[in-house]
Amino acid sequence: PGVSASYLEDKSIQRVHKALGIINVPPLKREDGTYWTKARVIQEFGFPVISKEIAGKVELLQNPSEKNKTVRHAIITGETGEYGGWQKNSKMQLNQRWLQLFGGYENENEGCDFQKPDFLVSAKCCYYLKEKNCDDWGKELNSVPYLGLMASEGGRRAKSLRMNGCNYFGASTIRSAPFAIFHRQDILKLALEMDELWKAGLKEKYHEKLLKEGRLSQSFEMPDSIIPEIYGTIEKKPDGTLYTTKAQRTGCSMCGFGIHMEKRPHRFDLLYESNPKEWDYLMFHMCKDANGNDYGWAKVLDYIGVGWDPSTIGGNCKGQMSLKDFIR
């Protein structure tokens, strides 16, 4: 069956998933028996910002221990110990932009003068909200996943596919990534072909099947297209290149990984248009500081220099990337 942590996605994606009968796997449960939520994970562990790799490094800086002392030194200086081969200028070091904003936790130890924010940073949200719960679901039902990863996406996903291939058989993990060899253009073409089938009668067949299985209510309105509204429509440029008129990529609505590289209107700007109530909550109310005051993504985006005010769309000078931001 199709399985997804759909509750993390945009509502238009959730609607399409429901129309296709995709199983929504809930998040992990906390020790008190309640489920982890976006707000609870962010409040306890920190904001997912910049990238998973960098967020993980900042989280180490924010949680110093004797055990991670050598790693923290490498994050600030690039110098590794014996385990890292005594390297200088290693890739462990944060680039200058992020060192300046997040390296202040080690000022006393390293004799530096960097800043530090008054909010937490972490990459743990993925684990608590989608990774571990989907893994547990697979083990419980003796199933292994087909993942929609593509090497063309780059980053950690491409690295994982290069290391492990399309089909991975490990000691405790088995998974297949059949889309690995395809590119974005292939997926957009497939989406158009599937949408034609949907409009040519597949929608009615799914509706009838899911009603019979008791997985849909009589009042549920099937979407006219299986291309979620958040993407807009799929159009073709003069050179034949396919593109989506709205969002280019989506994921968890509160994720900030890569936000500093997006031109405006970015993902939070689009959320403001589609769901202003959720946008307001994420921007200003999802966390509380030590004094009990609400805050959210607006504070984080201000700190890293990314615009978020809807009235300023059309320019985002503070958040523009420069060549040095890609070094290391």
Segments predicted by a language model, with ranges:
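ATP-dependent adenylation/nucleotidyltransferase module used to activate substrates
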Residues: P1-D186, E193
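ATP/NTP-dependent adenylation/nucleotidyl-transfer catalytic domains that generate, transfer
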Residues: R184-K199, K203-R328
